[in-house]
């Protein structure tokens, strides 16, 4: 049997692609080395932010706006919504390059972003403390996503639509042959007209030439009371310290507030090097500088987890076909800010499988930029 599309890596992007391609009428096989959603990639830990006025560059805004439409649609398939519109407050010094990019993206795309000075920030959210030279850019329409619920939903919907799924089955090789691609697994060989490689952190085990560096990261949950909950209108947030360190976090749920540091981490070369939380000395204290200065009412660390970023050299995505193989699409290098785009990236992969041109300018994400 020859599939229309085989997906290698069925985490965030792969799960979305499996659903959207199957829904479009294609014969699809989803493969994953584990049973998604799982703890071995970048999608676990309950929640991920979604921001529209994008501080990483306005080239992402059309993608994230389409992603939001797809998240809203996905939320209709569950009693518990995948997307929670908590609002996101972006905090930092008034001369922050990241905040300047947020403001520019908002202006270019007429997005609702409210600028607050330090006094206004503390007045609205007394739990937050910032220096006098800080500003906040508040995105009322943004919020957070329930990442594992999203993947569970896509996988369920894809299966119900007739998608074949092969999990707990690593891929060992890919062969390009004539008019198709053969994927070699522990379970046998499978062929397709086209392949999506969305293998996340460990994509280099299949494609060692890709410029992707795995980085071990951690996030943790800290003791928090009802003041920090979404019921009290406490928002999700990003925060930049005066030294440039970047943090992100979420409203407290069940008296626990989740926070992580975006920059930093440990470069690794294999899965065994991704040590569990607390096995690196700095894990438990990584968020302390932010919590002490910005959220001083937060209590002790309750628990945490480690994950991985698949970083590209410029921390922009890689969305491109393999050189010389137009039937093989690679989506990788999401660099720790990719989950919010998983829905639209899955749709892009489904369009690729159908032979449709991309609905977006993907030039900034081509592999050729690294030559």
Swiss-Prot record:
Transmembrane domains' residue ranges: none
Positions that bind FAD: 4-34
An MF annotation (GO) of this entry: flavin adenine dinucleotide binding
Cofactor dependence: FAD
Enzyme Commission code: 1.5.3.-
InterPro entries associated with the record: FAD-dep_OxRdtase, FAD/NAD-bd_sf, Me_Trp_Oxase_MTOX, MTOX
Matches recorded under Pfam families: DAO (PF01266)
Record note on quaternary structure: Monomer.
Protein name: N-methyl-L-tryptophan oxidase
Organism: Escherichia fergusonii (strain ATCC 35469 / DSM 13698 / CCUG 18766 / IAM 14443 / JCM 21226 / LMG 7866 / NBRC 102419 / NCTC 12128 / CDC 0568-73)
Protein's gene: solA
């Amino acid at each position: 049997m020859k599939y229309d599309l085989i997906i290698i890596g069925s985490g965030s992007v792969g799960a979305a692609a499996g659903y959207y391609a199957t829904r479009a009428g294609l014969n699809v096989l989803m493969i994953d080395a584990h049973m998604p959603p799982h703890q071995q990639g970048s999608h676990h830990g309950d929640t991920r932010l979604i921001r529209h006025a994008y501080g990483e560059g306005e080239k992402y805004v059309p993608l994230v706006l389409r992603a939001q439409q797809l998240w809203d649609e996905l939320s209709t398939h569950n009693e518990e919504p995948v997307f929670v519109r908590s609002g996101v407050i972006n905090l930092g010094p008034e001369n922050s390059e990241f905040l300047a990019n947020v403001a520019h993206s908002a202006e270019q795309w007429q997005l609702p972003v409210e600028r607050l000075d330090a006094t206004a920030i503390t007045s609205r959210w007394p739990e937050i403390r910032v220096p006098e030279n800080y500003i906040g850019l508040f995105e009322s329409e943004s919020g957070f996503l329930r990442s594992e619920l999203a993947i569970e939903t896509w996988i369920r919907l894809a299966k119900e639509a007739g998608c074949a799924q092969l999990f707990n089955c690593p891929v060992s090789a890919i062969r390009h042959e004539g008019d198709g691609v053969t994927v070699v697994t522990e379970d046998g060989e499978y062929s397709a007209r086209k392949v999506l490689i969305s293998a996340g952190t460990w994509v280099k085990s299949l494609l060692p030439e890709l410029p992707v560096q795995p980085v071990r990261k951690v996030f943790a949950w800290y003791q928090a009371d009802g003041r920090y909950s979404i019921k009290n209108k406490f928002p999700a947030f990003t925060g930049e310290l005066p030294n440039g360190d970047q943090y992100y976090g979420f409203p407290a749920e069940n008296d626990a507030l989740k926070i992580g540091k975006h920059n930093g981490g440990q470069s690794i070369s294999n899965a065994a090097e991704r040590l569990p939380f607390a096995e690196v000395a700095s894990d438990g204290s990584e968020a302390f500088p932010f919590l002490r200065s910005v959220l001083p009412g937060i209590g002790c660390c309750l628990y945490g987890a480690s994950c991985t970023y698949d970083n590209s050299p410029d921390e922009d995505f890689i969305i491109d076909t393999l050189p010389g193989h137009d039937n093989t699409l690679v989506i990788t290098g999401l660099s720790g800010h990719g989950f919010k785009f998983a829905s639209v990236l899955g749709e892009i992969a489904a369009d690729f499988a159908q032979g449709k041109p991309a609905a977006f300018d993907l030039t900034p994400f081509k592999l050729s930029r690294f030559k």
